């Protein structure tokens, strides 16, 4: 089975294409704003990233995975206000994540402790975690694992990657799913957390920029 560095290198290469490229400057600021629990206006994104409002609007229109409300405000991009199986509680606010790995990666990017609850994709048994920015505090059950896929392309982050990244209560609970997805793997939660830290590092220095296409 691949180690964390191999998974990280392959996913980094995949994330360097398609929709994921715009996440370099957009993702972390947007994630922090979504963590407040309210829809995010385009004007707020522009102010936070240093991009013109029209440029932010244009980029959002190119992202097939982004979730918008009727007013054009962002309500989901990795972290979402819409219910998913992956419950993500931060500062008493009930939010949701697109996939299991998101729940492990996002605490470091938003700088907050998060309480996570997600059903085992194989049995429905609840998997519960508390994750701080720099460590996994608790996992119940302790045998829980995370499925990982390495798609060849990432035109849509959610459909190509997130929709196949689940929690399982144990490796045995994941076996039927693995039999149906032979190119996939599972990692213990601690290893998946480290993989998330590797992948999240590309966004950690993102901040206001005055550039244009070269930063997209």
From Swiss-Prot:
User: EC number(s) for this protein?
Assistant: 4.99.1.2
**First-level EC class:** lyase
- Which biological processes are named by the entry's GO terms? response to mercury ion
Taxonomically, the superkingdom here is Bacteria
Q: Per the record, what are the reactions this protein catalyses?
A: an alkylmercury + H(+) = an alkane + Hg(2+)
Keywords assigned by UniProt? Lyase, Mercuric resistance, Mercury, Plasmid
Query: What the protein does?
Result: Cleaves the carbon-mercury bond of organomercurials such as phenylmercuric acetate. One product is Hg(2+), which is subsequently detoxified by the mercuric reductase.
| Protein name as annotated | Alkylmercury lyase
Q: Lineage, please? A: Bacteria, Bacillati, Bacillota, Bacilli, Bacillales
Name the gene behind this protein. Answer: merB
